């Protein structure tokens, strides 16, 4: 399933923090479920394994990642106060980069 695929890709760790507490991790869709096709909803390239607070920010477009994997946050978000790294860079596949480009351009509130 989707979560199991993400656990394999991200080695059962939060892509952002490295947290390995399974109960704290969420299988997060990059292109939101509500606008994704059936294929995109199940495509593991359209997902990140994130701790719950990072998932909440990502889902609401308050954080995102550029195509090169660099973390970006809305200007009013204090990542350190949330226990999140303020300078992170993820390594992901080119297929994931395409989904991330969509998220950065269409979901992230600070894209323009």
Protein language model features and the residues they cover:
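A detector for short metal-coordination/catalytic motifs
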Residues: 9, 19-22, 30-112
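Internal active-site segments that recognize and position negatively charged phosphoryl groups
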Residues: 1-18
